[in-house]
From Swiss-Prot:
It comes from Anaeromyxobacter sp. (strain K). It is an enzyme of class 2 (transferase). PROSITE patterns: RRNA_A_DIMETH (PS01131), SAM_RNA_A_N6_MT (PS51689). One of its GO terms (molecular function) is RNA binding. Gene3D superfamilies: Ribosomal RNA adenine dimethylase-like, domain 2 (1.10.8.100), Vaccinia Virus protein VP39 (3.40.50.150). S-adenosyl-L-methionine binds at N26, L28, G53, E74, D97, N127. This is Ribosomal RNA small subunit methyltransferase A. The gene is rsmA. It catalyses: adenosine(1518)/adenosine(1519) in 16S rRNA + 4 S-adenosyl-L-methionine = N(6)-dimethyladenosine(1518)/N(6)-dimethyladenosine(1519) in 16S rRNA + 4 S-adenosyl-L-homocysteine + 4 H(+).
Amino acid sequence: MTDHYPSPRALLDRYDLRAKKSWGQNFLGDEAVLDDIARLAAPRAGDAVLELGAGLGHLTARLLARGARVAAVERDRDMVRVLRGELGDRITLLEADAARLDYADLAARFGAAAAAGEGPRLAVVGNLPYHLTSPILFSILDQVAHVSRAVFLLQREVAERLAAPPASRDWGVLSVLLQREADVSVERIVPPGAFWPPPKVASAVLCALFRPPADAVADPARFRRLVKAGFGQRRKTLRNALGSAKLADPARLEAAFAAAGVDPGRRGETLTLAEWAALERTLG
């Protein structure tokens, strides 16, 4: 099936379409990259995969060729027409906003139990436009119990920030939140020429394998607020950044710094994941 799947340019011509720049549409056509992403998302035949933004169906076809069960999310009606025309009933097509999905419902409908006693989970895969990367990642983190892995094609700079080591220049809010929940790695760099039309910057394949959280926190929602506040004003010390966010009164903040062993004169980007978690626990 994949040997004869038309190129992005051929499909756009067949359906008299053009890539929508306002939607961030750059269609991946490189067969080696498509194969790598499909292998990472669906290592075994029968795996349940949720594809976000299926587009023209190139990755979808690769996933089907590996024996995956694919539910494809797409809200562009032109792309829906292509997917129905090329792949028909071989996929479950969901016309929905990829940033507003109910993963519990989707996992119950399409997922498979990862281990005895666990609820059904999904692998999530997609070529994400820049403007949707953060909303989609936050949505997944809010519902992480229903996701086993995520494999995304992202702008290279974004992927490298998400996989950045603690206390590095690229360490940020989503780095902390994602790495607390998953083992995160950049699997390969993808040049602009792998797409049609080619984007202006390089991309990268990011893989996140979800697992039990690395460091316990008392209140996950408060942990997120704490990390966002700590990185919100990078030039400020933690004492000033967290004080401005009014997460606690000054005396309680100082006591938390002391109990966690964190110098309040440091800046947020210098803290490790374990230090962020310790600081949140001591605020309790």
